[in-house]
Amino acid sequence: MPATDRKIRYPYAGSKSHHVTLGVFDTQSGKTIYLNTGEPAEQYLTNVSWTPDDKYVLVAVVNREQNQMWFKQFDAATGAFVKTLFEEISDKWVEPQHPAVFVPGSNNRFVWQSDRDGFNHLYLYETDGKVIRQISKGKFPVTSMYGFSTDGSHCFFQTADETGLNRYVWTANLKDGSSRRLNEEEGVHNGIISQNGDWAVDIFSNLATPRFIYTQKTTPGAVRNLAFGAKNPLEEYQVGITKFTSLPSPGGVRLNARLILPANYDAGKKYPAIIYVYNGSHVQMVTNSWMGGGEMWMQRMANEGYVVMSIDGRGSANRGCEFEQSTFRHLGDFEMEDQLTGVQYLQAQSYIDPARIGVFGWSFGGFMTTSLMTRPEAKGVFKCGIAGGPVLDWRMYEIMYTERYMDTPQENPEGYTQNSLYQYIGNLDGRLLMIHGTSDPVVLWQHSLKYVQECVKKGKQIDYFVYPEHEHNVIGPDRAHLYEMVERYFKDHL
């Protein structure tokens, strides 16, 4: 197969980082003015925005350690640093993900998102750095900022609830700080707000509802009108029984889990089970939406006689900082505890065959799958596993992601060593299939190639498959091939 060499910038955790500059290109003169972002050169320039008058550029500057952020203002015409509006500091990490959004009609008031109180919320600021008020409040995060009314008096946003399962649309009065939820029914509400802020479109689903679309005024007491009600697109098909459960975590919090049982479920039978795992940052797999956030291949496996389970353990998204940051410096440890809590739940069910439990995951989920198949804490639990695009040693993963959650290998050698999975190969008892795209720029092919090499050295047999020219995810028509292989592997070995 012909190949071409494609170079990418990929500094490993603990290595020298690339240096980034930020420039303003003048389309009239053809000149570029670079912002004087200063030293140290190893810093992250994130969430760039403009003031409405186009005179200034605002940048969230994050240090290499990612535990401090400075929100800085620069002169767009000269590149000169003007001032720091405010700072944010954490004993774990700061991770600004949204640029400043200016209030319509104002050149000096903007909304900033921050998790400084433990949950991601909205704050109204002035460009002198003064915070006017916190707009959203509660033990749940803002999950989306929709925008403003034309006159700038109100803003609109979406939040999760305290369970993390549901989503609601809110409006807030920027003048007096009052806020109000626009919908009550449990489920996932996604909003579209009219330009003047008078009307909202509510796109709603929950476990029992494929999709309803409502329109309503945003004023208090407004009645919503059903504009569209989708029929069940799967009503002619046999689908599994999807349900939620809440599990006690060893960390003292409740974990959301989703179970899909065969459509012809018989309580007197013993079923094999598959845990589909991710459990990494920024991902939530279990939501009170149509099919519970599950995917169609899970329904397929349920139809083939498997129980499919997913657990959002500590470290996953939309449960607040304490939940999400509990894994700091030890990626993989608490996540394993929580996934094994799910296994214990399965083993306690009379309809599960405890000797036939498998696990499947991709990317961070591939890391978790390999951990669960080989680390001593899970010895003998899983009969087989499938690890796709797996991180196998965090010292070989990219700098920004890894150092945010683990610090550097020099600062945290114990954490990196504990979660390097090559050392656990000797513990492998069940069947393990490892899959990788040969052009993966996210988790380099080196991870799994080295794993195979170490298996050879230690006399351990694994199954290995590559997708030529695919990157981190197998996409296009080849994805059908992937899931056929997954199904066959579980049928053959579980």
Region spans (language model):
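Predominantly five- to eight-bladed beta-propeller fold
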Residues: 1-34, 219-232, 285-295
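Conserved beta-propeller blade repeats
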Residues: 7-21, 36-62, 68-76, 81-113, ...
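Structural motif
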Residues: 19-21, 66-73, 118-123, 164-170, ...
